[in-house]
């Protein structure tokens, strides 16, 4: 069965050349017209002009432009991952006198009356209008083509499908595709006093209003007993403009498993700080396992409060830009990586994954354990990316940490960097694509990203060991001790052990037992055959035979700020 947010348009009239026009009564849209509603919200790049509506040709969304002339004379949009299709353009305007929406579309020689042409007309497809409608199962549906709005953490976060601030949903065996913004939302409820407040009120930055909305949610019933504990499994999620799955607060204690998440934000017609295959804030005790992420503008983005989060047994590849021409400085470049963990205090466990994109992990964070992974990309943004971008004044970002396995807030703190563990990983340096080198030149070394393209733990060189860190606090440290208060703001320790490095991947300087193989050339990649993906590599022929240490909760210890162990959600 199909649940669609779109309707067929079949009254096309030829205008000129490849351009056709059609009129639709605004009565079709009810009280929500996607063609008078612009995509907007906190952390959306304002220079992008896009309506929440879309036009689809045979199920594929076309490219909105801002004038009729751009429909008549379309140009290739080089930021898109699918440039050839970008000349299929559309423009819309309102006929106020007739109360109609007028479409102008370039079909590149096709007769739209002989093809399937649809426009999305509904904001959601399967989504309660009220909060608190829990314990619903959606199984085996095709859900597609809704006119969803941008879903930042400081707004009412909607998707085509979602539980709308409730508990215990199961979304399984569904195909979720072609949402204007987000496919599935496990997101925040509407707080009328704090809904895109940064955009609307302007006087408080979004980082502050986000802290405010978290505290407000706690006062208004955000608890383990009321919210979250959803399951998303075995879904095919693709071709959405912002995210495949989005969430803030509402996704706590959930399981996201065995999904295929791909081709997200490939059109590059939306840009901002909320884009990825999955983008979740406050993924407290969320388990993300056995998913396949590929061809996304970033695979998985865990932002703030990835506390008790586990990312395990996933396959990631092709989640960085294909070519340098796809980079867009106006859109924060959107270079992408497999996993981005941002200003969280942990504990976040990343284990038994295969990460094959050019950039494996962006780690502007602390409290992360990276264990038993096969990694063929680089670590970026280590030791940076945690301030708020002020030009001249200090702008540290304070983020919450919580009572272990609960939503109640225990405190707020900046990110000091470090407090990370790297055990028993295989690092392989892939050949660096010319396009990635050009992107690095284009974006440079900046506050948010260092552009590193070398695999391995070398970005953590110079971080203290636990023994070095503890030694700084020897003796009395209280008032009048003579010790500098800087002690409490210096980098935290990093633990390393059992890692193997091939093809020029580099270990951190302080790693004592690193195995660095400079003799053998390792090949690695993935290949699709008959709908199945295979890992092709010769690394198994050259792995050292020495035994690695068994890694356990006791080995990993606790994340510094929340003082919480790396343990299962049940403690």
Model-identified regions with their sequence ranges:
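Extracellular polysaccharide-degrading/modifying enzymes targeting complex plant/algal/animal polysaccharides
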Residues: 1-165, 170, 175-177, 185, ...
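Residues that act as N-cap/strand-start positions at coil-to-secondary-structure junctions
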Residues: 49, 84, 120-122, 155, ...
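Structural detector of coil-to-beta-strand junctions
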Residues: 125, 158-160, 182-183, 243-244, ...
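Residue-level marker of regulatory loop/turn positions in helix-turn-helix DNA-binding domains and
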Residues: 130, 153, 163, 224-225, ...
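Right-handed parallel beta-helix
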Residues: 134-147, 167-181, 193-213, 224-243, ...
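Glycan-recognition and catalytic cores of secretory/periplasmic carbohydrate-active enzymes
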Residues: 386
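Leucine-rich repeat domain C-terminal region
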Residues: 393-403
């Amino acid at each position: 069965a199909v649940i669609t947010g779109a309707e067929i348009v079949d009254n096309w009239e030829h205008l000129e050349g490849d351009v056709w026009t059609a009129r639709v009564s605004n009565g079709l849209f009810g009280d929500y017209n996607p063609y008078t509603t612009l995509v907007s919200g906190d952390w959306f790049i304002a220079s992008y002009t896009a309506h929440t509506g879309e036009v689809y040709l045979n199920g594929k969304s076309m490219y909105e432009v801002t004038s009729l002339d751009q429909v008549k004379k379309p140009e290739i949009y080089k930021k898109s991952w699918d440039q050839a299709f970008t000349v299929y353009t559309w423009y819309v305007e309102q006929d106020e006198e007739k109360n109609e929406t007028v479409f102008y579309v370039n079909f590149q020689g096709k007769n739209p009356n002989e093809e399937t042409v649809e426009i999305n007309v509904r904001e959601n497809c399967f989504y309660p209008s009220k909060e608190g409608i829990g314990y619903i199962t959606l199984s085996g549906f095709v859900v597609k083509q809704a006119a969803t709005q941008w879903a930042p953490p400081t707004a009412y976060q909607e998707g085509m499908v979602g539980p709308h601030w409730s508990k215990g949903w199961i979304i399984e065996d569904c195909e979720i595709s072609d949402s204007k913004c987000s496919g599935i939302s496990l997101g925040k409820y509407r707080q009328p006093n704090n809904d895109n407040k940064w955009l609307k009120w302007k006087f408080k930055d979004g980082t502050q209003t986000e802290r405010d909305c978290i505290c407000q949610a706690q006062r208004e019933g955000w608890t383990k007993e009321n919210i979250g504990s959803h399951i998303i499994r075995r879904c095919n999620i693709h071709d959405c403009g912002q995210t495949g799955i989005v969430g803030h607060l509402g996704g706590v204690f959930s399981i996201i498993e065995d999904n295929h998440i791909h081709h997200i934000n490939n059109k590059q017609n939306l840009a901002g700080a909320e884009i990825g295959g999955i983008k979740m804030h406050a993924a407290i005790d969320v388990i993300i396992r056995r998913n396949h992420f590929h061809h996304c503008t970033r695979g998985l983005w865990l932002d703030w409060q990835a506390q008790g989060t586990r990312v395990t047994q996933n396959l990631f590849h092709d989640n960085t830009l294909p070519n340098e021409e796809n980079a867009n400085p106006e859109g924060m470049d959107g270079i992408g990586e497999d996993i981005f963990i941002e200003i969280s205090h942990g504990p976040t466990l990343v284990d038994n994954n295969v990460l094959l994109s050019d950039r494996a992990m962006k780690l502007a964070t602390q409290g992360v354990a990276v264990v038993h992974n096969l990694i063929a990309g680089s670590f970026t943004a280590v030791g940076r990316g945690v301030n708020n971008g002020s030009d001249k004044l200090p702008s540290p970002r304070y983020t919450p940490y919580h009572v272990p396995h609960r939503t109640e807030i225990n405190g707020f703190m900046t990110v000091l960097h470090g407090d990370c563990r790297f055990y028993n990983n295989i690092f392989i340096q892939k050949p660096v694509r010319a396009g990635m080198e050009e992107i690095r030149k284009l974006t440079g070394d900046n506050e948010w990203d260092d552009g590193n393209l070398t695999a391995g733990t070398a970005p953590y060189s110079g971080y203290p060991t636990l023994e070095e860190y503890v030694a700084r606090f020897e003796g009395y440290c209280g008032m009048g001790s003579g010790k500098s208060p800087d002690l409490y703001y210096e980098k935290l320790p990093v633990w390393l052990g059992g890692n193997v490095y091939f093809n020029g991947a580099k270990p951190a300087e302080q790693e004592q037992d690193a195995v660095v193989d400079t003799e053998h050339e390792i090949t690695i990649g993935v290949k699709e055959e008959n709908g199945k993906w295979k890992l092709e590599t010769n690394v198994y022929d050259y792995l050292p035979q020495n035994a690695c240490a068994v890694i356990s909760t006791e080995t990993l210890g606790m994340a510094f700020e929340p003082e919480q162990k790396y343990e299962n959600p049940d403690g």
